[in-house]
């Protein structure tokens, strides 16, 4: 059977992941409600998302839904279970997905560092120019002219006397 995922969302009460999909064989739009059991505010969102995606009962339906999107939905549910507002939870998710250029990555633990590297890799792949892109150029030549006078540094001037 082939299914085309259209929308994916979360229901807070009772907790469930809701998928709106199109059944390609029948040509009809349908809705699938996948209940979330044994999930608390202390649960690991990435692990729960993996378990749902690999569940044989839902696997065919969630094939086109990314694991990252399922993790976000679980984080929204986790924030709701903690008593946080939707706005606060969305801000936390956005903060996790953006890279602060001033942040010292040496101070992060291994798990957080792996998350940051994953976000950077995704951002790199998104912005990377591929051969098939219309504005792709194979060789870019840059001319560094020597018309401008090179600026000298203060420490260069002091060491010139010794030579």
UniProtKB/Swiss-Prot annotation:
Domain of life per record: Eukaryota
Primary localisation category: cytoplasm
A cellular component term, taken from the record's GO annotations: cytoplasm
Protein keywords: Cell projection, Cilium, Cilium biogenesis/degradation, Cytoplasm, Cytoskeleton
Location(s), subcellular: Cytoplasm, Cytoskeleton, Microtubule organizing center, Centrosome, Centriole; Cytoplasm, Cytoskeleton, Spindle pole; Cytoplasm, Cytoskeleton, Cilium basal body
Tagged with keyword Cytoplasm: yes
Biological processes annotated in GO: cilium assembly
Disulphide bridges: none
Family: Belongs to the CEP19 family.
Function: Required for ciliation. Recruits the RABL2B GTPase to the ciliary base to initiate ciliation.
Name of the protein: Centrosomal protein of 19 kDa
Protein source organism: Xenopus tropicalis (Western clawed frog)
